[in-house]
Regions:
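Bacterial N-terminal signal peptides that target proteins for export
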Residues: 2-14
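C-terminal motif of bacterial Sec signal peptides marking the signal peptidase cleavage site
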Residues: 21-23
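Extracytoplasmic c-type cytochrome modules immediately beyond a signal peptide or single-pass transmembrane anchor
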Residues: 27-137, 146-183
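Short, cysteine/histidine-rich loop/knuckle motifs that typically chelate Zn2+
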Residues: 140
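Short Cys/His-rich local motifs and their 1-3 flanking residues in nucleic-acid-associated proteins
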Residues: 143
């Protein structure tokens, strides 16, 4: 079955999360933001694992670079936006701002935190930062480079010439999913 045919089913978690967030008056409450972040993470993880099963870690690189932004865009509706930021940048589009860096430092200092709140600005009413921690499968592309397949190293170097997102260990803070409520 093609991804195109499964797309409506794959987006159901987003619809449920958005409905939950929309039911909150004024600003997104913490549980709703966590639900939206979890839906995004589940959808991305499902595509990554399918890509890994179909063609190994080299195949997964394309999912992170091309599909992850699209999945985030699909989740960003009705005044809410979802994006990823990294503690070490691979994709320059995921470079954390100064406010993002402060939230990442707070998440690093609180390893058991489910999320941290960030301040808004002229465009964003509120931010929730949900930690992304390194899992075993993540180590294929984000672990030590001396253990990576040469084809994977080449794929990463081609797609991300300034890659800094390696050298992580299991459980490390990789970054965060940022859920923003817009004015």
């Amino acid at each position: 079955m093609s991804l195109r045919r499964r797309a409506p089913v794959r987006l159901l978690p987003f619809a449920a999360a958005i409905a939950t967030v929309a039911a909150c008056s004024g600003r997104a409450d913490d549980d709703a933001a966590l639900a939206l972040a979890a839906s995004f993470q589940q959808a991305l993880k499902a595509e990554l694992m399918a890509a890994m099963a179909a063609g190994g870690p080299v195949n997964a690189v394309k999912v992170c670079s091309e599909r992850a932004p699209a999945i985030a865009a699909e989740a960003s509706k009705d005044g809410y936006s979802v994006r990823r930021i990294g503690t070490r940048v691979r994709n320059l589009a995921n470079t954390p701002s100064t406010a993002d860096q402060q939230a990442l430092a707070e998440l690093a200092a609180k390893p058991d935190a489910r999320f941290v709140r960030g301040n808004g600005d002229d465009v964003v009413l509120a931010r929730r930062y949900v930690p992304l921690r390194i899992e075993a499968a993540c180590l294929n592309c984000h672990g030590k480079t001396d253990g990576m397949q040469s084809e994977l190293q080449q794929a990463l170097a081609t797609r991300y010439p300034d890659d800094k997102a390696t050298g992580y260990a299991l459980g490390d803070l990789r970054g965060a999913i940022v859920v923003e409520t817009r004015h």
